[in-house]
Every structure is written in structure tokens, then in C-alpha cells.
């Protein structure tokens, strides 16, 4: 969690770039402290390492990466966006692999942020930065492909999850469907 909080603190540092450098450092440190010491991040049930407890940190990595990229895309002086896109891609890929329903939370935000920043980058004619917008999605695809390949090499099944695809999902679906011999709708 602390690594994600530190990434977020540096991601938002362009917001106070016009302030005194010393004051900017204090604000960055304050944002880190606020995020690192959130009560929800230090609750006893979140200190165990399993998927529900690491998902907020993965989301924070993703959102910090996208915010850091967006804040640097609108600057007058062009700044490299790829490090922030790589952080967003790592958070997106890990979050997507951590929870099956992460696509419902993360992908719409990713698409909206990418679209908005793409409009800004086209207006500024920053074509390389526009192409770099694909980095999070390439990292997501590479992560899913790697995970499926590992499942295939170890278990012989090229699938992301047995619960949502493959023979287990088909068997569960067959057991859950009700089959009646009657063709009367209310019987």
C-alpha cells in the first residue's frame, strides 16, 4: 500500500509545480502521509495478504498512473508519459488478474481517461505520446496471455479462470439449468 501511496503522491505533484519547491515537497509528503495512513489501509483485516486486501493498492497504482499521465499531458513543457502509463498498466494488469470483476471497475475508467488524453495529445500534435497510450492495454494483454499460458503449461487448460470459462463453467451451467419435460409455461 505504501508503494501505491508514494506513486500517487508523485503522480499529483504537477498540481503544485507553480508553488515554491520547498512547499511542493511538503505537499507531496503530506499527500503521501494521508494516503499511507488511511484508516482503511491499516485495519487489521487488511493486513493479511490475499486478493481482496491487495486490490485497493492495485487500483491506486492504476489510478495514480493514469492521473500522473494526464497531469503531465496537459503541461506546456512536454514530459514523458510512458513511466506513468507503465505504472497504470501494471496496476491494470495485476488488478484485472486479481479479481474477475475488475474489468467492470477499471476498464471504463481506463477507456475514458485514454480518450480524453488522446484528444489533448492530438491537439498538441504529440504523436509518440498518443501511441504510448496503448502501453496499459498491451501490458494487460501480456499479463492475461502470460497467465493463460502458465495455466496451459501446468494444467493443460488455456484459460484465465476455471470458474468463468472451460469445462468447469460448462458443467456448472448444465447443473444449474432446470430442464422440465412439460411444455406448459406455468407448470
Can you say where each PLM-predicted feature lies in the sequence?
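Transmembrane and membrane-interface helices of multi-pass
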Residues: 11-42, 46, 85, 89, ...
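Juxtamembrane membrane-water interface segments immediately following transmembrane helices
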Residues: 136, 140-187
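Membrane-interfacial segments
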Residues: 15-23, 70-75, 118-123, 154, ...
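Multi-pass, polyprenyl lipid-linked donor-dependent membrane glycosyltransferases
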Residues: 1-2, 34-66, 94-111
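Membrane-interface alpha helices of multi-pass inner-membrane proteins
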Residues: 33, 84-99, 140-147
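Transmembrane-helix motifs of polytopic, lipid-linked glycan transferases
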Residues: 1-22, 61-65
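Membrane-interface transmembrane helices that cradle and orient dolichyl/undecaprenyl
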Residues: 62-83
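Membrane-interfacial entry segments at the cytosolic side of transmembrane helices
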Residues: 24-27, 79-84, 121-139
Amino acid at each position: 500500500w505504501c508503494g501505491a501511496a508514494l506513486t500517487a503522491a508523485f503522480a499529483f505533484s504537477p498540481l503544485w509545480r507553480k508553488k515554491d519547491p520547498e512547499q511542493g515537497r511538503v505537499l507531496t509528503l503530506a499527500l503521501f502521509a494521508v494516503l499511507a495512513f488511511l484508516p482503511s489501509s491499516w485495519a487489521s483485516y487488511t493486513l493479511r495478504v490475499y486478493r481482496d486486501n491487495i486490490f485497493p493498492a492495485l487500483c491506486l497504482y492504476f489510478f495514480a498512473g493514469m492521473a500522473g499521465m494526464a497531469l503531465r499531458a496537459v503541461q506546456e513543457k512536454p514530459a514523458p508519459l510512458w513511466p506513468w502509463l507503465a505504472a497504470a498498466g501494471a496496476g491494470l494488469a495485476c488488478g484485472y488478474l486479481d479479481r474477475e470483476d475488475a474489468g467492470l471497475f477499471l476498464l471504463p475508467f481506463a477507456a475514458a481517461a485514454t480518450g480524453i488524453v488522446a484528444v489533448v495529445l492530438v491537439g498538441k500534435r504529440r504523436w509518440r505520446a498518443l501511441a504510448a497510450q496503448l502501453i496499459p492495454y498491451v501490458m494487460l494483454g501480456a499479463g492475461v496471455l502470460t497467465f493463460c499460458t502458465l495455466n496451459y503449461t501446468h494444467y493443460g487448460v488455456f484459460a484465465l479462470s476455471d470458474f468463468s470459462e472451460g469445462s468447469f463453467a460448462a458443467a456448472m451451467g448444465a447443473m444449474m439449468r432446470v430442464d422440465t419435460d412439460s411444455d406448459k409455461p406455468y407448470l
